[in-house]
Amino acid sequence: MKSSTREQTPVTSPTPHDPTPPTPPRGSTPLFSRGSWLETRRITDVLRKETIGGALLLLGTVVALVWANSPWSSSYAGLRDTVIAPSLLHPLHLDLTLGQWAADGLLAIFFFIAGLELKREFVAGDLRDPRRALVPVAAAVGGMAVPAVVYVLVARSAGDGALNGWAIPTATDIAFAVAVLAVISTHLPTALRTFLLTLAVVDDLLAITIIAIFYTDTLAVLPLLGALAVIAVFGLLVQKRIRSWWLLIPLAVVAWALMHASGIHATVAGVLLGFTVPVLRSRAAGGPEAGPGMAEHFEHVWRPLSAGFAVPVFAFFSAGVTVGGLSGLVDSLQDRVALGIVAGLVVGKAAGILGATAAVSRFTRARLDPSLSWWDVLGASLLGGIGFTVSLLIGELAFGAGSVRDEHVKVGVLTGSLLAAALAAVVLRARNRVYRRLHEAERVDEDADGVPDVYQAPRLNG
């Protein structure tokens, strides 16, 4: 009798008190679906660490800005420009300042994590399924291409190599973005958080590709071949499941140093090293069901160092621009390079990510998840306009660290990122009541098995 009654109950659209979305049309692929419970737990853990890292990044940025605009600004510049160069390292061109060590050395750890994340996404995450990968990949490409075009349109009349900075507004800083989410205290749905993290991973790949191809002035072949050989040895060892840090860390350092000597930015070595690490457990170790693989293990070990130290220290040494008060800020923003960066981050990023997502929805069978609206996509797209770490790095490569134009780049990146964050906060806060209902629905576990019911729906319906 119960079964008959259940079959006659009509399916209705969600009401304000029923946040469970209706089932998408058969044959369509939902955009921004929440994914599996295991993937959601992993992403939640990653974003929790990135939130702490984002807070430290903001702290490093604020300290640098205050110090650089204080009466003691010369001491900040002196610290940043202090050369740490043992004579043994001179043949490898490693006579670097503290600021350069942060950009070339510490950020290699950040890009090593990016390499691990990217490989994991392609092997065991959302990107392994072409249908699920289509949206974040298209959004990342749109979020790179449109800001670059906007920058070129704004800055093309500036001259003096202004177009060298076309890639500056193409990057997204996930740590900064999740720090903004923490500040505005919004219950962003799991599906959007997953999209943001996956977008940032693909974004990092595009950024490092741009750096390697477009910002390499000279190329020394022998050091490059040496770096690739050492990376191959590193890869062989990790494929054999060797985890001895006393062996792997020296190899990674040698690969980094040789990559730096080759003329290619040393952070590229970090990504390539990350790509070599296996994601899944071997059959001898019990297979994928036995637990996380080596890539996830390495990520757990190194992410706190990346998010909690490497990126904040880089921000401290890179964000310290002497603004000179309101008049100095206005003067900096009169440079069309700075204006192009602001326009690229605020307008270009949002238009590129939102437009690419809409195009996927328009020209494929993919449809927006019923629990979300296009306002949510706009909010996530605006968050994508928070470009900081990689944007500052590309600015230094494009115009030279410490140059006048590099100072204007810093002002543009800071201004554009703050504007994008403010606009995202307005849009997402307006939807926070909806997000809170979705968040509560995603926590319901009526059968008390430790897995929220929404993640069991496909199995139960089957």
From Swiss-Prot:
Coiled coil: none
Catalysed reactions listed for this entry: Na(+)(in) + 2 H(+)(out) = Na(+)(out) + 2 H(+)(in)
Domain of life according to the entry: Bacteria
Pfam families, alphabetized: Na_H_antiport_1
GO MF terms held by the record: sodium:proton antiporter activity
Keywords of this entry: Antiport, Cell membrane, Ion transport, Membrane, Sodium, Sodium transport, Transmembrane, Transmembrane helix, Transport
Classification via InterPro entries: Na/H_antiporter_dom_sf, NhaA
Compositional bias ranges of the Pro residues kind: 16-27
Gene Ontology cellular-component annotations: plasma membrane
Its membrane topology: Multi-pass membrane protein
Annotated segments matching region Disordered: 1-31
Biological process, per Gene Ontology: regulation of pH
Subcellular location per the Swiss-Prot or TrEMBL entry: Cell membrane
Spans through the membrane: 52-72, 96-116, 134-154, 165-185, 195-215, 218-238, 244-264, 309-329, 337-357, 382-402, 408-428
Recorded family membership: Belongs to the NhaA Na(+)/H(+) (TC 2.A.33) antiporter family.
Task of the protein: Na(+)/H(+) antiporter that extrudes sodium in exchange for external protons.
Protein name, per record: Na(+)/H(+) antiporter NhaA 2
Gene that this sequence comes from: nhaA2
